[in-house]
């Protein structure tokens, strides 16, 4: 067994909704802990899946190259097909990156806090993980701090943008300024899983950097704004030379036919994504106003969640859970991550949080 495996804790997935409802005797559970799209999935997806099942091809292996999906993503993002690597969610892409590029002699730089799988897969490969705390006042990535810890062993820097769990968005210019100062043999991978929820995704994306730098890649997923968390489709856009390396170790039939069909249908319904993002923006502003009024510290988010801190945060999370609202805890002491739900959930939750805060005063 690899030595690094002994150093990691197993990922704890979300409990099934029915189990949580049964445990707390709930008629309804608003799961606002996993950053899922509360508005469901495009109706085109259901139609496409039914047609695919009726075609009766489930006894055949899927298209190992995801040809239709590859062509559509390439067209929408204006990138070549051989720059794309598809995975079973971004989880697989992150794992592939670690397996392909990291050795026990390498170092990986990540923000603290950041998505846990960056460090997890680096540790599995025996690489050292250097965490650089975000700005405590704003939550922004500390580019100067990251540059200070980069050395000859640094093989990879992860930038989650917007960052999970803080929700903070870095500008493409700030990231490019950083890339220019990073050694050319150090990879900079930018995870844009939540970019669709930003105020202006087209201006916020770092995709143009992939064309300008041979050590930069951008990751995207259909699990969030597209509402396909259950289907598991993610992809990376990278220079052809890097993509070819990942393709060598990717499982040949990793995306099943139903996943490919669902992804194509979802990508073709951009109106659904824009509508979900617009609703999210409205509710996100309500939460920011609420926290401002209540004097609660939070980080300005450009994602579909808000990261905030209160004393006795675990008690607040438990209180909300017993009322049918599940938020994400155990990320940092006294910090909670709240997935932004629909308007009706916002109204009820804010009343519950306000009441809890009064009791704590």
UniProtKB/Swiss-Prot annotation:
Domain of life: Bacteria
Keywords: Amino-acid biosynthesis, Aminotransferase, Histidine biosynthesis, Pyridoxal phosphate, Transferase
Matches recorded under Pfam families: Aminotran_1_2 (PF00155)
Cofactor or coenzyme needed: pyridoxal 5'-phosphate
Residue numbers bearing the N6-(pyridoxal phosphate)lysine modification: 224
Pathway named in the protein's UniProt entry: Amino-acid biosynthesis; L-histidine biosynthesis; L-histidine from 5-phospho-alpha-D-ribose 1-diphosphate: step 7/9
Coiled coil: none
Protein EC: 2.6.1.9
Catalysed conversion reaction: L-histidinol phosphate + 2-oxoglutarate = 3-(imidazol-4-yl)-2-oxopropyl phosphate + L-glutamate
Enzyme class, broadest EC rank: transferase
Gene Ontology biological process terms in this record: L-histidine biosynthetic process
Listed GO MF terms: histidinol-phosphate transaminase activity; pyridoxal phosphate binding
Keyword Amino-acid biosynthesis: yes
NCBIfam families, per the entry: hisC
The family this protein is said to belong to: Belongs to the class-II pyridoxal-phosphate-dependent aminotransferase family. Histidinol-phosphate aminotransferase subfamily.
Annotated PANTHER family: HISTIDINOL-PHOSPHATE AMINOTRANSFERASE (PTHR43643:SF3), HISTIDINOL-PHOSPHATE AMINOTRANSFERASE 2 (PTHR43643)
Subunit record text: Homodimer.
Protein name, entry field: Histidinol-phosphate aminotransferase
Species for this entry: Limosilactobacillus fermentum (strain NBRC 3956 / LMG 18251)
Protein's gene: hisC
